[in-house]
Design a protein with these regions (language model features):
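Conserved, structured core segments of small domains
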Residues: 1-114
């Protein structure tokens, strides 16, 4: 299952940057585990986005854990919006089209901190 995570900064960029090395290290760990397909900052620099692929079984729990364990979330620097996504067309997609949306909680899943 695919998901897009929109990350919105809750603090000034100067403060967010103090945690960015830990955030990047965390993302590299997600990439090594095969969960993170792409990541990058938004323009203007008020947040970022992640393209995630998680197993269908336990998808919501995995997405919640990804959000909750991010140093940005743990320090209150940012909040996540998790959006389940069903890609239909693209260079790296399997030939079969996904016919149904997975049954997850509502699309918005914010950190409960701060």
């Amino acid at each position: 299952m695919y998901a897009i995570a929109l990350i919105r900064y809750r603090r000034p960029l100067e403060e967010v940057l103090t945690v960015s090395d830990a955030h990047r290290a965390y993302l590299l760990g997600l990439k090594e585990r095969g969960l993170l397909l792409a990541s990058g900052p938004l323009n203007p620099r008020n947040g970022g986005a992640l393209l995630l692929r998680v197993p269908e079984e336990g998808a919501q729990e995995t997405l919640d854990r990804i959000r909750d364990e991010d140093p940005y979330t743990k320090t209150g620097m940012a909040q996540y919006e998790l959006l389940p996504w069903v890609p239909n067309l693209g260079a790296e997609l399997p030939q079969t089209r996904v016919a149904r949306l997975p049954s997850l909680r509502p699309a918005v899943s914010y950190a409960s901190c701060c």
